[in-house]
């Protein structure tokens, strides 16, 4: 199965890593910037707050808690920290419950994610903006400046 993912930020990189764990999948990650995770490097004043030990539905302040509930139930704090540990990232928890990389630098998070993307079944398309997405009978087509990609699923 060919899975396309538009956006090379934290969510896009995580989705690509997760999808590529099944080696039968081919993953194409599209990012218009030349480098992946650029905004991630600036989060948390350059420290990158990964999670919070107090993360649960009681602390959700959005308009649709029913929408957030399945995600929080399925991939909570422990699962998040375990996922980052499996990628090789050490973390530290502050007394406030905030979780940061042990290095206290967002670059550590970006580096770990980029390293995890270095798999034979992941293709990175960077520095090229997606100009058109077209739904096809058998999946999708993504047009980038001068290139066209087809696949089965699109995130």
What are the residue ranges of the model-derived segments?
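Predominantly flavin-linked oxidoreductase catalytic cores and closely associated redox partners
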Residues: 107-108, 112-155
């Amino acid at each position: 199965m060919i899975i396309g993912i538009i956006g090379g930020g934290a969510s896009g990189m995580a989705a690509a890593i997760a999808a590529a764990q099944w080696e039968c999948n081919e993953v194409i990650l599209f990012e218009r910037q030349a480098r992946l995770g650029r905004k991630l490097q600036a989060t948390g004043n350059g420290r990158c707050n990964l999670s919070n030990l107090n993360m649960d539905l009681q602390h959700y302040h959005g308009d649709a808690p029913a929408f957030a509930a399945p995600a929080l139930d399925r991939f909570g704090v422990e699962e998040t920290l375990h996922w980052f540990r499996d990628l090789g990232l050490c973390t530290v928890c502050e007394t406030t419950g905030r979780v940061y990389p042990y290095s206290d630098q967002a670059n550590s998070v970006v580096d770990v994610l980029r390293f995890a993307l270095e798999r034979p079944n992941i293709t990175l398309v960077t520095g090229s903006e997606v100009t058109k997405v077209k739904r096809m009978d058998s999946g999708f087509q993504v047009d980038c400046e001068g290139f066209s990609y087809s696949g089965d699923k699109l995130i």
